[in-house]
Amino acid sequence: MRYAPEFKKSPSHLLKKFAVCDIPLYDICDYNVSRDRCKELGCCFYKGICYEKAVPSYVQVFSALIVIIAGAFVITIIYRVIQESRREKEVPTEAPVSAKSSVQVETQPPSSAGAGSKAPSVERPQSKESGREDASLIVTEEEETED
Protein backbone atom coordinates (compact mmCIF):
# COMPACT_ATOMS: atom_id res chain seq x y z
CA MET A 1 0.00 0.00 0.00
CA ARG A 2 1.52 3.25 -1.09
CA TYR A 3 1.06 6.45 0.93
CA ALA A 4 -0.48 9.45 -0.79
CA PRO A 5 0.43 12.74 0.87
CA GLU A 6 -2.45 14.59 2.46
CA PHE A 7 -3.06 18.05 1.10
CA LYS A 8 -4.78 20.04 3.76
CA LYS A 9 -5.91 23.60 3.74
CA SER A 10 -3.10 25.86 4.87
CA PRO A 11 -3.78 28.75 7.26
CA SER A 12 -5.40 31.82 5.75
CA HIS A 13 -3.04 34.11 3.88
CA LEU A 14 -3.25 36.93 6.43
CA LEU A 15 -2.55 34.67 9.40
CA LYS A 16 0.09 32.57 7.65
CA LYS A 17 2.79 34.88 9.01
CA PHE A 18 1.80 33.83 12.51
CA ALA A 19 2.05 30.07 11.85
CA VAL A 20 4.43 28.44 14.30
CA CYS A 21 5.89 25.04 15.06
CA ASP A 22 4.56 24.86 18.62
CA ILE A 23 3.26 21.61 20.02
CA PRO A 24 0.58 20.26 19.57
CA LEU A 25 0.90 19.92 15.81
CA TYR A 26 -1.97 17.98 14.29
CA ASP A 27 -1.80 18.25 10.51
CA ILE A 28 0.83 16.03 8.92
CA CYS A 29 2.57 17.62 5.98
CA ASP A 30 4.37 14.51 4.64
CA TYR A 31 5.75 11.15 5.81
CA ASN A 32 9.23 9.71 5.28
CA VAL A 33 10.99 12.92 4.36
CA SER A 34 14.23 14.36 5.58
CA ARG A 35 14.44 17.38 7.82
CA ASP A 36 15.71 19.50 4.91
CA ARG A 37 12.87 18.44 2.61
CA CYS A 38 10.36 19.22 5.39
CA LYS A 39 11.78 22.74 5.75
CA GLU A 40 11.55 23.20 1.97
CA LEU A 41 7.86 22.36 2.17
CA GLY A 42 7.46 25.05 4.84
CA CYS A 43 6.58 22.53 7.51
CA CYS A 44 7.92 21.58 10.94
CA PHE A 45 10.00 18.46 11.58
CA TYR A 46 9.22 16.87 14.95
CA LYS A 47 10.13 13.32 16.08
CA GLY A 48 10.67 12.03 12.55
CA ILE A 49 7.36 13.34 11.19
CA CYS A 50 6.86 16.44 9.09
CA TYR A 51 3.96 18.52 10.47
CA GLU A 52 2.23 21.51 8.95
CA LYS A 53 2.74 24.80 10.74
CA ALA A 54 -0.26 25.86 12.75
CA VAL A 55 -1.70 29.22 13.69
CA PRO A 56 -2.42 29.14 17.43
CA SER A 57 -6.05 29.61 18.43
CA TYR A 58 -5.25 32.64 20.58
CA VAL A 59 -3.82 34.40 17.50
CA GLN A 60 -7.01 33.65 15.56
CA VAL A 61 -9.20 34.96 18.39
CA PHE A 62 -7.07 38.07 18.81
CA SER A 63 -7.19 38.77 15.07
CA ALA A 64 -10.98 38.36 15.01
CA LEU A 65 -11.28 40.73 17.98
CA ILE A 66 -9.20 43.37 16.22
CA VAL A 67 -11.36 43.10 13.10
CA ILE A 68 -14.57 43.44 15.15
CA ILE A 69 -13.32 46.50 17.05
CA ALA A 70 -12.06 48.15 13.85
CA GLY A 71 -15.43 47.49 12.18
CA ALA A 72 -17.32 49.02 15.10
CA PHE A 73 -15.03 52.07 14.99
CA VAL A 74 -15.59 52.57 11.26
CA ILE A 75 -19.37 52.18 11.63
CA THR A 76 -19.39 54.73 14.48
CA ILE A 77 -17.44 57.27 12.41
CA ILE A 78 -19.76 56.80 9.41
CA TYR A 79 -22.84 57.19 11.64
CA ARG A 80 -21.51 60.45 13.12
CA VAL A 81 -20.72 61.87 9.68
CA ILE A 82 -24.23 61.05 8.45
CA GLN A 83 -25.83 62.61 11.54
CA GLU A 84 -23.74 65.77 11.15
CA SER A 85 -24.71 66.11 7.49
CA ARG A 86 -28.39 65.73 8.42
CA ARG A 87 -28.06 68.47 11.04
CA GLU A 88 -26.42 70.79 8.52
CA LYS A 89 -29.29 70.19 6.08
CA GLU A 90 -31.90 70.99 8.74
CA VAL A 91 -30.38 74.35 9.78
CA PRO A 92 -30.77 76.23 6.43
CA THR A 93 -34.42 75.15 6.07
CA GLU A 94 -35.34 76.39 9.55
CA ALA A 95 -33.56 79.77 9.35
CA PRO A 96 -35.76 81.38 6.62
CA VAL A 97 -38.96 80.37 8.42
CA SER A 98 -37.97 82.15 11.64
CA ALA A 99 -36.76 85.18 9.66
CA LYS A 100 -40.14 85.49 7.91
CA SER A 101 -42.06 85.35 11.18
CA SER A 102 -39.92 88.13 12.69
CA VAL A 103 -40.53 90.33 9.63
CA GLN A 104 -44.29 89.81 9.91
CA VAL A 105 -44.33 90.83 13.56
CA GLU A 106 -42.26 93.97 12.89
CA THR A 107 -44.44 95.10 9.96
CA GLN A 108 -47.63 95.17 12.01
CA PRO A 109 -48.60 98.77 12.82
CA PRO A 110 -48.32 99.60 16.51
CA SER A 111 -51.58 100.27 18.35
CA SER A 112 -52.31 103.71 19.70
CA ALA A 113 -50.82 104.11 23.12
CA GLY A 114 -54.08 105.19 24.74
CA ALA A 115 -55.53 104.26 28.08
CA GLY A 116 -55.77 100.51 28.62
CA SER A 117 -54.28 99.69 25.23
CA LYS A 118 -51.87 96.83 24.81
CA ALA A 119 -48.57 97.41 23.04
CA PRO A 120 -46.57 94.40 21.94
CA SER A 121 -42.93 94.31 22.93
CA VAL A 122 -40.48 92.15 21.05
CA GLU A 123 -37.58 90.28 22.60
CA ARG A 124 -35.00 88.44 20.56
CA PRO A 125 -32.81 86.10 22.58
CA GLN A 126 -30.13 84.48 20.46
CA SER A 127 -27.92 81.55 21.27
CA LYS A 128 -24.97 80.07 19.43
CA GLU A 129 -24.45 76.37 19.57
CA SER A 130 -21.73 74.42 17.76
CA GLY A 131 -21.09 77.00 15.08
CA ARG A 132 -24.69 77.58 14.02
CA GLU A 133 -27.05 80.35 15.03
CA ASP A 134 -30.62 79.65 16.11
CA ALA A 135 -32.81 82.74 16.30
CA SER A 136 -36.08 82.68 18.17
CA LEU A 137 -38.68 85.37 18.57
CA ILE A 138 -40.74 85.91 21.73
CA VAL A 139 -43.65 88.33 21.59
CA THR A 140 -45.14 89.44 24.90
CA GLU A 141 -47.94 91.86 25.58
CA GLU A 142 -47.75 94.17 28.56
CA GLU A 143 -50.55 96.30 29.91
CA GLU A 144 -49.87 99.96 30.34
CA THR A 145 -51.59 101.65 33.22
CA GLU A 146 -52.13 105.38 33.59
CA ASP A 147 -51.52 106.95 36.93
From Swiss-Prot:
Entries under InterPro entries matching the protein: TEX29 (IPR031685)
Residue ranges with Polar residues bias: 99-108
Cytoplasmic side: 79-147
Subcellular location, record wording: Membrane
Cellular component terms per the entry's GO annotation: membrane
Keywords assigned by UniProt, alphabetized: Membrane, Transmembrane, Transmembrane helix
Transmembrane stretches, start-end: 58-78
Keyword Flavoprotein: no
Bias (Basic and acidic residues) ranges: 125-135
Principal localisation: membrane
Superkingdom of the source species: Eukaryota
Low complexity: bias regions: 109-120
Extracellular topological domain: 1-57
Membrane topology type: Single-pass membrane protein
Region entry Disordered, spans: 86-147
Any Pfam family matching the protein: TEX29
Alphabetical list of PANTHER family matching this protein: TESTIS-EXPRESSED PROTEIN 29
Name of this protein: Testis-expressed protein 29
Organism: Bos taurus
